[in-house]
Amino acid sequence: MRHKRSTKRVKRASATQLYRTCKAAGTCPPDVIPKVEGNTVADQILKYGSMAVFFGGLGIGSGSGTGGRSGYVPLGTTPPTAATNIPIRPPVTVESIPLDTIGPLDSSIVSLVEETSFIESGAPVVTPRVPPTTGFTITTSTDTTPAILDVTSISTHDNPTFTDPSVLHPPTPAETSGHFVLSSSSISTHNYEEIPMDTFIVSTDSNNITNSTPIPGSRPTTRLGLYSKGTQQVKVVDPAFMTSPAKLITYDNPAYEGLNPDTTLQFEHEDISLAPDPDFMDIIALHRPALTSRKGTIRYSRVGNKRTMHTRSGKAIGARVHYYQDLSSITEDIELQPLQHVPSSLPHTTVSTSLNDGMFDIYAPIDTEEDIIFSASSNNTLYTTSNTAYVPSNTTIPLSSGYDIPITAGPDIVFNSNTITNTVLPVPTGPIYSIIADGGDFYLHPSYYLLKRRRKRIPYFFADVSVAV
């Protein structure tokens, strides 16, 4: 039986090992010497190509792959720069402390008591010497040459760095007692001058731009954008749109009961369901209302957001709808009839006056023996009856000028040329008392805290008024 000879390949020696043995004998293979000496084709390309191209600092070559000094920087980024303004602490001059030589016979106890250093204050303040004012010395001379005086001015400035600081004492605490006196005579009024304030409006042009303080109250109003092209217009007839709009979107749901209709309403629809009103289908938000005026009407408007589709991320996509309901129409002014005022010398009468089929009536108390018959008509007619035959006549009576209802001329009342006497209203007067409060356990009566009541105005028209002469 023949055994097969082993064909194991023997590893060739490295180029460095071959170069050591074959260089002296001259038997080196042709690829060993250029590889060891760095004279291959690639080395020659780098050697001659580096003369035209400079790659300094990039670490390209046969060195380590560290990227040079600054390292590798990602493309498209800026390498970090070091801060240039680094605060440098000023050098502190340290005085050298001389060393004391300790001998073998010196004491082993070191004294820890330091000598007290005295810092002298600054230069003393020079006080100029003032000569005594006992009299003047007058020197006379016959020489007419003007005298030349040597005048020297001395100014002294105190430097707070070299002067002793002044001692500041805390203020004395104030004390008060619990007794005080309130009296009307101690109250005095001051006459202050009222200066009218003007608002300055700065006008500018397109060339010169001037900045000025904004005028208060001139904030621009934000447009609602109710009638834009991307907003759907829907007219609502149901009156529940103004009081409880949630009933038009969802059926009876306790979660939406008690919501304020004047705020923005949010709705959540988990599944597909029909709304009570088809116009409010898929509404997820109904914004707060707004009153607008358009084409002679007062309009109640609300903007709603629909959710017709939604993405996986939860974003809702839908239309923007403008729901509106016209409240009333703005008509022209109503023609009013003036009331005549005559003297009060007429007897007790009764007038039945009607405007637009009896909107208000004026009656007088019956305190005579005659029976009065009145009826509503379009003109002022008076019917008076007695035991004899009556004669119809038109009579105008004056209105009462009591204390509570003063009669004054206005846009709806026309007086005759007779003079009107102003009625003097009685004003109650009384003694003025002084309140003296002494002590710390008192309280004022609640009536002193009440403010002055504002006088209520009584309407003179479109109401039943009782007239007495």
Curated annotation (Swiss-Prot):
Entry keyword annotation includes Disulfide bond: yes
Keywords: Capsid protein, Cytoplasmic inwards viral transport, Disulfide bond, DNA-binding, Host endosome, Host Golgi apparatus, Host nucleus, Host-virus interaction, Late protein, Microtubular inwards viral transport, Phosphoprotein, Viral penetration into host nucleus, Virion, Virus entry into host cell
Main location group: virion
GO biological process: microtubule-dependent intracellular transport of viral material towards nucleus; symbiont entry into host cell; viral penetration into host nucleus
S-S bridge residues: 22-28
Localization (cell): Virion; Host nucleus; Host early endosome; Host Golgi apparatus
Domain of life: Viruses
GO cellular component: host cell; host cell endosome; host cell Golgi apparatus; host cell nucleus; viral capsid
InterPro entries xref list: Late_L2
Post-translational modification (record): Highly phosphorylated.
GO molecular function: DNA binding; structural molecule activity
Motif placement: Nuclear localization signal: 1-13, 450-458
Pfam name, any one: Late_protein_L2
Keyword Cytoplasm recorded: no
Family from the record: Belongs to the papillomaviridae L2 protein family.
Function as written in the Swiss-Prot or TrEMBL entry: Minor protein of the capsid that localizes along the inner surface of the virion, within the central cavities beneath the L1 pentamers. Plays a role in capsid stabilization through interaction with the major capsid protein L1. Once the virion enters the host cell, L2 escorts the genomic DNA into the nucleus by promoting escape from the endosomal compartments and traffic through the host Golgi network.
Subunit structure: Interacts with major capsid protein L1. Interacts with E2; this interaction inhibits E2 transcriptional activity but not the DNA replication function E2. Interacts with host GADD45GIP1. Interacts with host HSPA8; this interaction is required for L2 nuclear translocation. Interacts with host importins KPNB2 and KPNB3. Forms a complex with importin alpha2-beta1 heterodimers via interaction with the importin alpha2 adapter. Interacts with host DYNLT1; this interaction is essential for virus intracellular transport during entry.
Protein name: Minor capsid protein L2
Taxonomic lineage from the root: Viruses, Monodnaviria, Shotokuvirae, Cossaviricota, Papovaviricetes
Gene this protein is translated from: L2
